[in-house]
Amino acid sequence: MRNMITMGEFIVKKQADYPTATGELTSLLSSIRLAAKVVNREINKAGLADIIGSMGAENVQGEVQQKLDVYANERFKAALEARGEVCGMASEEEEDFVSFDSELSRHSKYVVLIDPLDGSSNIDVNVSVGTIFSIYRRVSKPGAGVTLEDFLQPGNRQVAAGYVVYGSSTMLVYTTGFGVNGFTYDPSIGCFCLSHENIRIPEEGKIYSINEGNYIKFPDGVKKYLKYCQERDEATHRPYTSRYIGSLVSDFHRNLLKGGIYIYPSGTNSPNGKLRLLYECNPMAFLVEQAGGKASDGFGRIMDIQPTALHQRTPYFVGSTKMVDRAEAFMREFSSHEDPANQG
């Protein structure tokens, strides 16, 4: 039996490798870890606690807010504000960014962007959901209020990113730019413990994840790629397997471990795609690149996109490098940015 290493111990050990580290990022990750435990507890008893279902209101995306969406947003907001390591937060559930105004917070150097509960519409049927987070250094002067520009940074400036998947077991996966590590929650001791060290995504996979019910709305490049995935060819081990849960965190997590590609393209009714660049696509892109994979909008690197709006959307292709490369080749050959279903 190997020695159990908690996430806290792992982070402190890594921090010791950098003598100039101040410990602020370590404390920030601890706050996220704490909030994840609280949210996990509520998800596990959701059917008994009258917090399943809709609030009857819509968030800024025009999506009906689930009760747990609101709960998770408040828990992460409270945890991030409490210790003062964050000067502001942007969330899928908030129309504008949130500024933390304590003296300690105003002098902190980090901002967090978060999707507090991805896939929450699946909770009623007991399907896995998750939390996605992204951390940047602010660009505004410490001591002053946080600004929109602090959040509108390209993904290549992220200092950390990760997700929590609340499933048959609860797991937190994160990167600080030095590889990807996963920690499984042990409820008997109340700690996330190292279970997946130095995760590497297979260069090639056999799984494609996309909502094929929207096929008629897809750009031609995606349609051609799907046909390629479904064709029989022993040399390339096709046809591939279609697996789509409908929760970005769950689909991404499976493909990260097993190899595969997740696609949410533009469509005739959503020319800019559906997924949010800043707090869904960029953090997953940082993770997959650190694990040896690739993330694209179909034509170029996701993390090189300069954001212009807090809730900006983008088409998304993420997963095993060779699969994303091949999907991009189909997009370049059969689609263009000018087509109504391909405007990124």
Curated annotation (Swiss-Prot):
It is found in: Cytoplasm. Its EC number is 3.1.3.11. GO terms for cellular component: cytosol. The keyword Magnesium applies. It is an enzyme of class 3 (hydrolase). Keywords: Carbohydrate metabolism, Cytoplasm, Hydrolase, Magnesium, Metal-binding. It comes from the Bacteria. Mg(2+) 2 binds at residues 115, 118, 280. One of its GO terms (molecular function) is magnesium ion binding. It holds the Pfam family FBPase. The keyword Iron-sulfur does not apply. Its cofactor is Mg(2+). Mg(2+) 1 binds at residues 92, 115, 117. Substrate binds at residues 118-121, 211, 244, 274. Belongs to the FBPase class 1 family. This is Fructose-1,6-bisphosphatase class 1. It comes from Aeromonas hydrophila subsp. hydrophila (strain ATCC 7966 / DSM 30187 / BCRC 13018 / CCUG 14551 / JCM 1027 / KCTC 2358 / NCIMB 9240 / NCTC 8049).
